[in-house]
């Protein structure tokens, strides 16, 4: 009887495993991939409840445009050693973020939290 339960449980585990997508886990992008994705493009997402757009210029300038706030101009770069995106704002200095490829697009990861976003080709901010 115990053997039959074990075999049933093993069969169920195999069945579930066979139908779990292989790409279900988010993967962190590398430095060269990030530079190519971001340069001359705009990220659109929601950060802590506020919609935003952020443009990444080829000269290392980034423009952060929150839906209900003041536009900020800062700097951006990719850290080749860590493979992370870094942004600089006068009020806080350099801050690093892992960038993940997800099932629905991309996400920033900072301090254990993820913030989904999509990338739009070109510049889609006012300034």
Annotate each predicted stretch with a short phrase:
Residues 13-17:
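Alpha-helical transmembrane segments
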Residues 9, 19-77, 81-127:
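Lipid interaction determinants
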Residues 3-7, 12:
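N-terminal export leaders
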Residues 1-4, 22:
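Intrinsically disordered, low-complexity cationic segments
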